[in-house]
Structure formats: C-alpha cells, structure tokens
Amino acid sequence: MRISLFSGRGTELVPGLVSAIHKQPVTVPVLCTFAGLEEDEQSDQRHHGGPDRALHYYPADHYLWWQTWQTALGLPAPRTPWQPAAFGENLSGLGLTETQACIGDVYRLGEALIQISQPRSPCFKLNQRFGYGQMSQVMQLSGRCGWLLRVLEEGMITPEATMELVDRPYPELTVKRTADILFNQVRNEADLLMLLENPALSPNWRQHAADWLEHGTVADWQRRLLGPESLRLS
C-alpha cells in the first residue's frame, strides 16, 4: 500500500494556541527515528509524541466521508480543506481503516519497522482547525480517529513509500473496537480486561482501562474534546 508522508513544526493555530497540526508533504527521503519523522515536531509533549505516539496514521478513505457529512448538515466550508494532512497525520493512504487495522500490527515502511500502539484520542484543537465546535466529538463517536504508532526499527523512508503488513498478533482487536470499548460503549469488564492485558497497547490506554475497571466510572473526556472555556466554539 502506497503511503504519503507529512511533517510539520509548531505554529499558532489561533491566538494563544500553538500546535504542530499544520503538516506539509515530505518530498525527500526522511529518517524515521524512535521519536518519529526527523523533520516532524509535537508542540504539546504531554499529550503528543513519545515512543508510543511517534507517528500518526489517518486513512485517506475518510476525507470523502467528512465532505459528505459537512454537506449533509449544511455546514459552511471548513477552515482547512478535506485533504490528506488536514488531521495533522504523518502517514496517509487508501485501503486501510480502523475496522481493518489492529492493535499490535507491525508494518514495514521503507527501511523502518512500525507498530500500531493505540487509536488517536481526538482533542479540541481539531475544532479550531476546522471551525466546527463539535468536530472532535463527531470524530470520536464515528470512530474515524486514525491511530498512533511506535517505531520498532529506525530507517529511511522515501516519499510515496509502500507499507506492508509484517505481523498481526491480535486480529480480534481492531483499532475501531479498541476505541469503542473506551469511548462509545457501556462498561464491559471482559473488554476492559482485554485492553489492560494487551502488551502492544500503549501504557496510557491500558491505564484508562485499569481506571475504569477500578473506579467503575468512565473518564471525563470534556476538557480533551472541548478545551478550555476561552477556546470553545459554538
């Protein structure tokens, strides 16, 4: 499967809010390190980046769905066009979505070896990016979040490289199912235990599962999805 590469640096998304969501196509070979693409940056180190969130993949398949969603609701044009890199992804391609990709999947991308570690957790910066106050919530509910990956082996990646599946150790745990267990379904102890015990799932997501099991209440996603009061859109 052919993959497009994107990278970017932190810039001001709106006054007072810096983000590295603005990505540009990578046009020359780039080194993929354990921290991600060499030319890429994460502005919010607390919620982005790190060894388990080195890369973000977003399916190009979804862009037509978003355009249809916008048109069907009669919404104004988004601040950012519906096209690859709009969601701040590093990797994008056609033919692989959250219903097919699985936690723990290992792929060869150029010389690098990468592994799916967790679904993406949408945040309020997407609302500002597109100009829709409920964008992050729709993304979470629809399951069109994309996913994050860790780098198992560093290596060079060329533009328009191909990504090939090497191993799928957990075919029962798709990215979509993983996201639904935490985001979109009632508390299910067996499902939460499955997440907690999966060694390929990121520690952050395993902790979310542990917390829900221990406390019996779902996490409050409001601040992540909507942001501070001063930055909320109607």
Go through each PLM region and give its residues:
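A short pocket-lining beta-strand/turn micro-motif at the edge of beta-sheets
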Residues: 28, 145-147, 161
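Short hydrophobic beta/alpha edge segments that flank linear recognition/processing sites
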Residues: 162-166
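A mid-sequence, solvent-exposed acidic-amphipathic segment
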Residues: 133-153
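Electropositive, beta-rich accessory/interaction domains or terminal extensions
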Residues: 1-128, 134, 167-234
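Loop/turn positions that initiate beta-strands
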Residues: 104, 154, 158-161
